[in-house]
């Protein structure tokens, strides 16, 4: 499922807790 890396998104939009980037502060969020 496509997602966008953001620092924050609504809990129900979170797909993965980490974006797989070096910075784990970004989360993978569901795209609108």
Curated annotation (Swiss-Prot):
Its main location: secreted. One of its GO terms (cellular component) is extracellular region. Keywords: Antibiotic, Antimicrobial, Defensin, Disulfide bond, Secreted. Pfam families: Defensin_RK-1. It comes from the Eukaryota. Disulfide bonds join 3-29, 5-19, 9-28. GO terms for biological process: defense response to bacterium. InterPro entries: Defensin_RK-1. It is found in: Secreted. Has antimicrobial activity against E.coli and activates ion channel activity. Belongs to the alpha-defensin family. This is Corticostatin-related peptide RK-1.
